[in-house]
Amino acid sequence: MKQFKVIIVEDVKLELKGTMGIFSQEIPEAEEIGTAMSEAEFWPLLEQEVPDLVLLDLGLGGSTTIGVEVCRRLKGEHPEVRVLIFTGEVTNEKLWVDVLEAGADGIILKTGELLTQVDVQAVMEGKRMVFNQPILEKIVERFSQAVRTDVRRQEALIQYEMDEYDERYLRHLAV
């Protein structure tokens, strides 16, 4: 992987420090050009220098919609910048959909395996929809539920038998 520039946006000081440590120890190709603990700190950083990657916490300032809006605006103004969401939002799947629709290149949950060089490399190489194990498990679980529901619906339709009344009614409609 070639060298790239990153801005880390994280509102919890301890998590910011840990994320910076992951980048410095595990992803030496990353040059950290700035960190922000809020949306207000992020935009001036971006004006100084546009990074190749923004690692963005979804729940800035306790509001989950701020991360989505930051992503949407960033991708609107700088579509070439990769955005990797690094979040603790485990249960709010709608947020995952919202941020992907806003242009995020991937989502890594802070639970489970942390940020890895493989994930970052995939995003930097242009791969979309980069997820770690907890997200993939949730996606597969939801997909399985949807398939089972759809199969039950189809089976219900197939098992329906027409009786004499249904036939007469359909003939009447056809006339």
Regions found by a protein language model. Name each.
Residues 12-39:
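Two-component/phosphorelay signaling modules centered on CheY-like receiver
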Residues 20, 35-53, 61:
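Acidic, metal-coordinating helix/loop segments flanking the phosphotransfer/catalytic sites
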Residues 47-49, 73-81, 102:
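Conserved phosphotransfer cores of two-component systems
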